[in-house]
Swiss-Prot record:
It catalyses: N(2)-formyl-N(1)-(5-phospho-beta-D-ribosyl)glycinamide + L-glutamine + ATP + H2O = 2-formamido-N(1)-(5-O-phospho-beta-D-ribosyl)acetamidine + L-glutamate + ADP + phosphate + H(+); L-glutamine + H2O = L-glutamate + NH4(+). The lineage of its organism: Bacteria, Pseudomonadati, Pseudomonadota, Alphaproteobacteria, Sphingomonadales. It is found in: Cytoplasm. GO terms for cellular component: cytoplasm. Pathway: Purine metabolism; IMP biosynthesis via de novo pathway; 5-amino-1-(5-phospho-D-ribosyl)imidazole from N(2)-formyl-N(1)-(5-phospho-D-ribosyl)glycinamide: step 1/2. This is Phosphoribosylformylglycinamidine synthase subunit PurQ. One of its GO terms (molecular function) is phosphoribosylformylglycinamidine synthase activity. Its EC number is 6.3.5.3, 3.5.1.2. Part of the FGAM synthase complex composed of 1 PurL, 1 PurQ and 2 PurS subunits.
C-alpha cells in the first residue's frame, strides 16, 4: 500500500495525517509538495490535509485547488484511487470541482475547535465500511470556514444518492442539513471537515477516526 499526503504552503495537519496513515499501513506516506506535477508511481491512497493553504487568500482552498499537483490528484480520482480531503483538504476538493458544494464562514463567525458528535449516514462507502449505519462517533473539528453550502437541488441529489457520509449532531457551524462529510458520485473521494487523524489514539481522547483509515486502506481487522 502506497499512500501520499499533499502538502501546500500553510498546511499544518500534514504530519498528523502522515502519522495516521503510517499507524495503519506500517509505512510512512510520501509527502508530495504542491508544485509537483505527478504522484509517486503506484500511489494507492491520497490525503489532502487540514491547514490554511496559501493563507486562505481569496477563499479557503481556492489557490491550492489550482496547484500543479491537483491535476494529478484529479486524474487519480478519476481512475478510482481513494482521495480523502480533511478540513482545508475538503475545501480544496470543492474548489477543484471534485466534490459538490462550498465551505463558507461558520454561521457563528467564530473558529470552532472541539470534539463533536457525528452520525454516520452512509456506512457502505470504502471510507465508512467499518462503522454501523446511524452510529454516533466523536471526532475533533478545528475550522473557521466549515459551513457547508449547496443549492437545494444539489442537496436533494446527494442525499438521494447516499453521498452524505457524516452529519453533525449539534449544529456546529450552520452547515446545510448539518452535513459534515460528502462523497463523490463514484464513492472514492471523501471530503469532511472533522479531523479523523486526530482521533486515532486513546491517549489523545479517542479512536473513532482510526476505523476510517482502517476501512479505506483495506486492513480492517
Amino acid at each position: 500500500m502506497k499512500t501520499a499526503v499533499i502538502v501546500f504552503p500553510g498546511s499544518n495537519c500534514d504530519r498528523d495525517m502522515a502519522v495516521a496513515l503510517e499507524t495503519v499501513t506500517g509505512k510512512a506516506p510520501a509527502m508530495v509538495w504542491h508544485r509537483e506535477t505527478g504522484l509517486p508511481e503506484g500511489t494507492d491512497f491520497i490525503a489532502l490535509p487540514g491547514g490554511f493553504s496559501y493563507g486562505d487568500y481569496l477563499r479557503s482552498g481556492a489557490m491550492a485547488a489550482r496547484s500543479p499537483i491537483l491535476r494529478a490528484v484529479a486524474e487519480a480520482a478519476g481512475r478510482g484511487v481513494p482521495v480523502l480531503g480533511v478540513c482545508n483538504g475538503f475545501q480544496v476538493l470543492t474548489e477543484a470541482g471534485l466534490l459538490p458544494g462550498a465551505l463558507m464562514r461558520n454561521a457563528g463567525l467564530n473558529f470552532v475547535c472541539r470534539t463533536v458528535p457525528l452520525k454516520v449516514e452512509n456506512s457502505q462507502s470504502l471510507f465508512t465500511a467499518a462503522y454501523g449505519a446511524g452510529e454516533e462517533i466523536a471526532i475533533p473539528v478545528a475550522h473557521h470556514d466549515g459551513n457547508y453550502f449547496a443549492d437545494a437541488d444539489t442537496l436533494d441529489r446527494i442525499e438521494g444518492e447516499g453521498r452524505v457520509a457524516f452529519r453533525y449532531l449539534d449544529g456546529v457551524n450552520g452547515s446545510a442539513r448539518d452535513i459534515a462529510g460528502v462523497l463523490n458520485d463514484a464513492g472514492n473521494v471523501l471530503g469532511m471537515m472533522p479531523h479523523p487523524e486526530r482521533a486515532i489514539d486513546r491517549a489523545h481522547g479517542g479512536t473513532d477516526g482510526l476505523r476510517l483509515f482502517e476501512a479505506a486502506l483495506g486492513v480492517l481487522a
